[in-house]
Amino acid sequence: MENMPSDKSGNTSKNARKNFWVIVLLPAVTFYWTAACGSVSWTRKSSVTGDMPIPNDGKQQTCCLVLDIDKDGIDDFVIGERTQAPSVVWYKYNGKGWDKLVIDNTRKNPEAGGDFCDIDRDGDLDIVLGQDASGNNIWWWENPCPDFSKPWTCRYIKNSGGNKHHDQTVGDFDSDGQVELVSWNQQAKQLLLFEIPADPKSSGPWPSTVIYSWSTRREREGFPSLPVDIDLDGKLDIVGGGRWFKHLGGTKYEENIIDPEMAFTQCAAGQLVKGGRPEVVSSPGDMNGDAKWYEWNGKQWSAHKLRYVVHGHTCEIRDIDGDGNMDIFIGEMGQPGAGDDAKTYIWYGDGKGNFTENIASHGQGIHEGKLGDLDGDGDLDILMKPYSHRTPRVDVLLNCGLRKLSSDNE
């Protein structure tokens, strides 16, 4: 079983495990899933076939989170859209499909990214999202669990300074026993650190510290969905923008470059090769290029090419097939990007640095896609949220176990 770090409340609500096989026909499009012996097979559920409602009528679905909102042990998911209301909704599994509930019924213009933790320390998970290039806001929403007839109260974390906040991460990065929030602020060209106030319900916006800045035109973005301890010193580290940042004390962090060419990418981190430091994966999310994984050889980061991807704006490391070895999950956005040729890839690892490439989906774009146990059966499913390809829409690929036979992918 995967050695899982705990979530932001100290629980392991994001599971990793086992797996099935299927060919599914959807209206107007036939989707086939690959077939390598030993790969996981998937069955598709979709808003197109009535398995869940669409988020709203807008066509720019930006952000996506997977977390257990109602504490029932099944991962729920959150989707944000930036052109219409409701701007933020969440989905709960009902045994056959997913019901939609509203988090924010106003237009908020959320950017890609976001994260979650128990901000108000009441035992449930609250969510954090940043505004896109149209504004300078970062917000948090108070989870009303267990009474979802009550509204999610929205409060400011940031409402001044530079615009655009593409990606946030939450973790105890200074090992003080309290989690911190870290956010890229692209138009300010800064990486911001926020300590959660003692009374976050009456405090806001929160004070912030600039822990890194840059002067070049190239933006920085990306964080792993699960933070890791890169240098094995017992502290979680901040990873993103082709770099990792080591805590030196107080609010001081040291920049360490993994690959300067991967500044504008999505990334993941995890133990792809057993023993030693965790590895890092970078995928060009808002452009085309080579997705790579990086391992520390004792002196420097050694790069290994996975493949050329077209706007690979989904990137995670998890044990998808439940064999005890970490796998790599990367998906192409579709629009902009490869359009109807968009693919979602999985590289199944053996724990020794060897990978078998597999295509989980071909024909539907995925943006900010996530892995989680979305039907409560104990394995990892795929949340396929597109940005603007065939939107508005949401798809879920349910993990059906390991294939026994192989067939050709079409």
Regions found by a protein language model. Give the residues of each.
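N-terminal secretory signal peptides that target proteins for export/translocation
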Residues: 1-18
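Sequence-pattern detector for short linear motifs
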Residues: 11, 20-21, 47, 388
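Local alpha-helix boundary/kink/capping signal
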Residues: 11, 33-34
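Bacterial N-terminal signal peptides
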Residues: 22-32
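Beta-propeller-forming repeat regions
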Residues: 37-410
